[in-house]
């Protein structure tokens, strides 16, 4: 449903060292805004804006690991061309935008019109950074988290002056339930073993 104003969620978390086995005391604040709206005959759009900050010095898994996706199944809140735990930040801001053109394009093609396919497009942009103090925690050879996480995943930080960006496009409403999308990574193309192109699918059941 179209939302005339964004739905805003503000979340604060405090961790207590020693409580339920916790190793750190920390504070985290996360802000999220979500809205759907129509663009007249152009179709409908939705966006999710998210920002987070922690002043605490913590190992990477307790900061803000950005959600990557290495599968072929589309996950709406994930970055489709980002690897698992490829980037982590202690402060970040992101926007994820999706647009459904509805019948604007395919309804002009007689045979395709009967199938009721819908052309979709999306774009994700993420800005973030990580303080050097948090980098050093994961470099500590005495850290119990080092062998468990650091050797398996990158946990790198983003350049605060260079966003992570990706775009996608595809077809929705195939057989009324299937969506197929292609995604292109636009930045950090030489970072590790990047996923420059991904083809993904998802299934949506409506009752």
Regions found by a protein language model. Name each.
Residues 1-207:
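Exposed, low-structure sequence patches enriched in small/polar residues
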């Amino acid at each position: 449903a179209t939302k005339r104003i964004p739905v805003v969620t503000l979340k604060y978390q405090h961790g207590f060292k020693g409580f339920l086995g916790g190793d750190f005391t920390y504070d985290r604040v996360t802000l999220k805004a979500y809205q759907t709206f129509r663009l007249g005959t152009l179709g409908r759009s939705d966006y999710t804006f998210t920002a987070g900050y922690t002043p605490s010095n913590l190992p990477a898994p307790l900061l803000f690991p950005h959600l990557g996706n290495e599968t072929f199944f589309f996950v709406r809140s994930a970055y489709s061309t980002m690897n698992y735990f490829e980037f982590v930040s202690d402060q970040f801001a992101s926007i994820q935008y999706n647009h459904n053109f509805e019948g604007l394009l395919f309804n002009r093609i007689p045979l395709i019109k009967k199938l009721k396919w819908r052309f979709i497009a999306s774009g994700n942009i993420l800005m973030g950074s990580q303080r050097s103090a948090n980098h050093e925690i994961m470099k500590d050879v005495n850290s119990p988290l080092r062998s468990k996480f650091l050797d398996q995943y990158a946990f790198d930080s983003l350049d605060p002056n260079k966003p992570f960006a990706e775009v996608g496009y595809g077809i929705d409403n195939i057989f009324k339930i299937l969506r197929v999308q292609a995604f292109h990574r636009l930045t950090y193309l030489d970072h590790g073993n990047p996923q420059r192109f991904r083809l993904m699918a998802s299934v949506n059941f409506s009752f």
